[in-house]
């Protein structure tokens, strides 16, 4: 599918939201943190629903994790091997992805200030590649990247070989690296890349939300 066609056809786009992390630095489950009138995971689901097929949004949770109420079409998968990094969650999400989806945006649940224009731009950058990933110097952002569902087999092979770093995946399949500075036109503060790991990050994000209103 061409870039322009994918841009205009949300039905071919899906999303994976990883929310099974321990949240030890935050001190509580980030998925259920209040953020405005919603909880954190609910907000991220709603924002992504503006850009992708909502029936192709997969929330990847930990075993036994209690999630906030979500729209009935949202899919939930379980990370059966916790503590092995984002590739494990990515594999769980891709396995649960509907067959009609051609590209998937992967994110964590703790990015409530996500800019949907950033997400759209990452889909546009994918082109004929298997992955489009933002890069900041030498650092890749695997949880703000777009993946073709067909890479699942490669992800599973890497996991079986205990190659858990996303960089191994980027080296294995055709990947386009997108300089984060070029994405500021869509997200001037790059808030889509701002994870809330500590209570002070959460408080700062709440202040930013209030300033937007």
Q: Where are each of the predicted segments found?
A:
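N-terminal donor/sugar-recognition subdomains of glycan-related enzymes
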Residues: 3, 198
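Nucleotide and nucleotide-moiety/phosphate-recognizing core
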Residues: 6-163, 171-190, 203-212
